From Swiss-Prot:
This is Zein-alpha 19C2. Belongs to the zein family. The alpha zeins of 19 kDa and 22 kDa account for 70% of the total zein fraction. They are encoded by a large multigene family. Structurally, 22K and 19K zeins are composed of nine adjacent, topologically antiparallel helices clustered within a distorted cylinder. It comes from the Eukaryota. It comes from Zea mays (Maize). InterPro entries: Maize_Zein_Storage, Zein. Residues 1-21 form the signal peptide. Pfam families: Zein. Keywords: Repeat, Seed storage protein, Signal, Storage protein. Interacts with OP10 (via N-terminus). GO terms for molecular function: nutrient reservoir activity. Zeins are major seed storage proteins.
Length: 240
């Protein structure tokens, strides 16, 4: 008998709980709305308009509020990871907007040193990879300067001679091919040495020197082969 009475009491209590219970649909906004703090913006109220827009509008509300939310809300929200990602993205964008102008100002202020660093970057890499090659690169301008200086030292007497005595410098220029010929062909240079008095005699008279230049092949032929030169003279006399 006691068991039946206890069973009836249990059924009565269960029926009372069922009668007083409120069933919330899965897409209903009532559980979330009841957990939202009262100080959030009024945009939260518009979430209940359409359940399909619940996650999107909730993200907008969180981004606009920038206020810590209740832990129960995050437990009830199905878009927890998406909301957290959105909040982190918004904070990163805000930080970027604050920091980017400062970076631009620093870059503009230090544009010249930055440009110089970019120009010297290959040399720095070369010095790290191959110190010997980097040292040669550093000495290259000095090598070029030494070569140019050596050439200037060789030409210095001629330059001084040209400044002090233009006539003597002109004679040096006339005799320069003979000096080169002496270095290349000694026999031809000896022949030229035999003709040197004629060059010195007619150096002051360009017209006579030009005639001598025209007669030079015949003179060289006379020195190297007198018989052939004599035949040339006979043939020339017969023609004229």
């Amino acid at each position: 008998m006691a068991t039946k009475i206890f069973s009836l009491l249990m059924l009565l209590a269960l029926s009372t709980c069922v009668a007083n219970a409120t069933i919330f649909p899965q897409c209903s906004q009532a559980p979330i709305a009841s957990l939202l703090p009262p100080y959030l913006p009024s945009i939260i109220a518009s979430i209940c308009e359409n359940p399909a827009l619940q996650p999107y509008r909730l993200q907008q509300a969180i981004a606009a509020s920038n206020i810590p939310l209740s832990p129960l809300l995050f437990q009830q929200s199905p878009a927890l990871s998406l909301v957290q990602s959105l909040v982190q993205t918004i904070r990163a964008q805000q930080l970027q907007q604050l920091v980017l102008p400062l970076i631009n100002q620093v870059a503009l202020a230090n544009l010249s040193p930055y440009s110089q660093q970019q120009q010297f970057l290959p040399f720095n890499q070369l010095s790290t990879l191959n110190p010997a090659a980097y040292l040669q690169q550093q000495l290259l301008p000095f090598s070029q300067l030494a070569t140019a200086y050596s050439q200037q030292q060789q030409l210095l007497p001629f330059n001084q001679l040209a400044a002090l005595n233009p006539a003597a410098y002109l004679q040096q220029q006339i005799l320069l091919p003979f000096s080169q010929l002496a270095a290349a062909n000694r026999a031809s240079f000896l022949t030229q040495q035999q003709l040197l008095p004629f060059y010195q005699q007619f150096a002051a008279n360009p017209a006579t020197l030009l005639q001598l230049q025209q007669l030079l092949p015949f003179v060289q032929l006379a020195l190297t082969d007198p018989a052939a030169s004599y035949q040339q003279h006979i043939i020339g006399g017969a023609l004229f």
